[in-house]
Amino acid sequence: MPASLRSPLAIILGAIPGALARYYATIFLAGLFGNDLPYATFLINFSGCVGMGLVVTLATQPALMSPDLRLLLAVGFLGSYTTFSTYALEVTSLWRMGQLGQGVLYGLGSLGIGTIGVLLGSLIARRLTI
């Protein structure tokens, strides 16, 4: 297989089961806990963050995980299972590099800008349908 196709293929092979895992986990957890609060999303985000921590830590040792497997799991599976795990990884990476202020700013800024983005998108959609 050409080297240029290895990375995209690894990501694709992880993304499909990641998306399906999120879908079925959401159905299962909503049935278990109800829909009063978004428990399913909360638990999926938490489990995705645990998974990201495991993958990224194991990937630092090439004997334990190949670069292709890291892409399949971290970018493909966990990326489609929950992007929150990537966000949390980026915040903790900034902290580990001694950039506490930037980590806090990025973390809070992402939450704020994400919320504003959803509100803005909703406003635009309402304007388009009027």
From Swiss-Prot:
Reactions accelerated catalytically: fluoride(in) = fluoride(out)
Bilayer disposition of the protein: Multi-pass membrane protein
Keyword match Cytoplasm: no
Binding site for Na(+): 79, 82
Compartments where found: Cell inner membrane
The UniProt record lists the keyword Transmembrane helix: yes
Membrane-crossing segments per the record: 9-29, 39-59, 71-91, 104-124
CC per GO annotation: plasma membrane
Keyword field: Cell inner membrane, Cell membrane, Ion channel, Ion transport, Membrane, Metal-binding, Sodium, Transmembrane, Transmembrane helix, Transport
GO biological process, one term: cellular detoxification of fluoride
GO molecular-function terms, A-Z: fluoride channel activity; fluoride transmembrane transporter activity; metal ion binding
Pfam name, any one: CRCB
Activity regulation information from UniProt: Na(+) is not transported, but it plays an essential structural role and its presence is essential for fluoride channel function.
Signal peptide: none
Function in brief: Fluoride-specific ion channel. Important for reducing fluoride concentration in the cell, thus reducing its toxicity.
NCBIfam families: crcB
Record family assignment: Belongs to the fluoride channel Fluc/FEX (TC 1.A.43) family.
Protein name, entry field: Fluoride-specific ion channel FluC
Organism: Synechocystis sp. (strain ATCC 27184 / PCC 6803 / Kazusa)
Upper lineage: Bacteria, Bacillati, Cyanobacteriota, Cyanophyceae, Synechococcales
Annotated gene: fluC
